């Protein structure tokens, strides 16, 4: 996975998330939407709609009180916790 900041200001961040697919992007987007201060989260990886873009572009918008980079860090941490919880539960079940 490679990340490249496309655009950033106090309340919005757009980054390219190279090497990822819909599965990962949907999980990350869903967790971002549950994150305090995030007002919108979306991604685009459709070349026809994004001028030939083939890698996912993630856009995060916040209420302005939360830095979008901080929101992304929080969402990444929460996603990691969810995956660890699933792994622990699965391990106990089998």
UniProtKB/Swiss-Prot annotation:
Primary site of residence: cytoplasm
Compartment annotation: Cytoplasm
This protein's GO CC annotations: cytoplasm; DNA-directed RNA polymerase complex
Catalysis: reaction(s): RNA(n) + a ribonucleoside 5'-triphosphate = RNA(n+1) + diphosphate
Keyword Transferase: yes
PROSITE patterns noted in UniProt: RNA_POL_L_13KD
UniProt entry keywords in alphabetical sequence: Cytoplasm, DNA-directed RNA polymerase, Nucleotidyltransferase, Transcription, Transferase
Any one Gene Ontology molecular-function term assigned to this protein's record: DNA-directed RNA polymerase activity
Pfam families attached to this UniProt entry: RNA_pol_L_2
EC number: 2.7.7.6
Biological role: DNA-dependent RNA polymerase (RNAP) catalyzes the transcription of DNA into RNA using the four ribonucleoside triphosphates as substrates.
Protein name: DNA-directed RNA polymerase subunit Rpo11
Species: Halobacterium salinarum (strain ATCC 700922 / JCM 11081 / NRC-1)
Gene name tied to this protein: rpo11
């Amino acid at each position: 996975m490679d990340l490249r900041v496309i655009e950033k200001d106090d309340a919005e961040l757009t980054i390219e998330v190279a090497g990822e697919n819909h599965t990962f992007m949907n999980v990350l987007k869903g967790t971002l939407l549950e994150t305090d201060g995030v007002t919108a989260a979306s991604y685009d990886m459709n070349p026809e709609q994004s001028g030939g873009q083939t890698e996912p572009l993630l856009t995060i918008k916040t209420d302005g009180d939360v830095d979008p980079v901080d929101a992304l860090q929080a969402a990444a941490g929460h996603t990691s916790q969810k995956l660890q919880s699933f792994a622990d539960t699965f391990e106990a079940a089998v």
